């Protein structure tokens, strides 16, 4: 069953330099949520792919009431899980996150270190800190999340 991260969908659009990716790169680089209509378009495009025919797991969606309303129109949810974590834990985890430039693998400097510092265990790619994983940007993302979710 595919795991669909809306953050990954956004990053793929930016990486592939699509028209939509160009429009949303400013939002994500400043820690702002991508507009609802854009997120709904990205999600609808993804969940109509063949691997989603028997179901999928959504990560990071819906974040707003309009997104939830649109999701009800395009799909049905069997289960919903909402995880709650303190801001301090979120900031610590995200500011310690490392991402592989090559395969997108995720590591953490404190809790899930790679075998070789700075290198992905899966593909050997370079690990880096995303621009939106800086504490100030994370704090901004949390504020936006609270206002819009």
Provide a role label for each language-model segment.
Residues 2-76, 86, 99-102, 130:
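ATP-dependent small-molecule kinase phosphotransfer cores
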Residues 19-22, 39, 62, 81, ...:
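Low-complexity, compositionally biased segments
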Residues 23, 67-70, 79, 93, ...:
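Residue-level recognition of specific faces of alpha-helices
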Residues 38-46, 106-149:
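Small-molecule kinase domains that catalyze NTP-dependent phosphoryl transfer to phosphate-bearing small molecules
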Residues 59, 75-97, 101-102, 110-122:
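Conserved phosphate-donor/acceptor-positioning beta-strand/loop module used by diverse small-molecule
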């Amino acid at each position: 069953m595919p795991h669909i991260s809306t953050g990954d969908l956004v990053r793929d659009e930016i990486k592939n330099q699509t028209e939509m990716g160009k429009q949303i790169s400013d939002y994500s680089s400043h820690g702002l949520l991508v507009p609802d209509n854009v997120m709904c378009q990205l999600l609808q495009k993804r969940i109509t792919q063949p691997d989603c025919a028997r179901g999928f797991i959504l990560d990071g969606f819906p974040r707003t009431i309009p997104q939830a309303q649109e999701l009800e129109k395009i799909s049905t949810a069997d289960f919903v899980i909402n995880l709650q974590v303190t801001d301090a834990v979120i900031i610590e985890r995200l500011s310690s996150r490392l991402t592989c430039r090559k395969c997108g693998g995720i590591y953490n400097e404190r809790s899930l270190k790679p075998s070789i510092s700075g290198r992905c265990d899966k593909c050997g790619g370079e690990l880096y800190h995303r621009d939106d994983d800086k504490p100030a940007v994370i704090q901004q993302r949390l504020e936006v999340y609270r206002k819009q979710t």
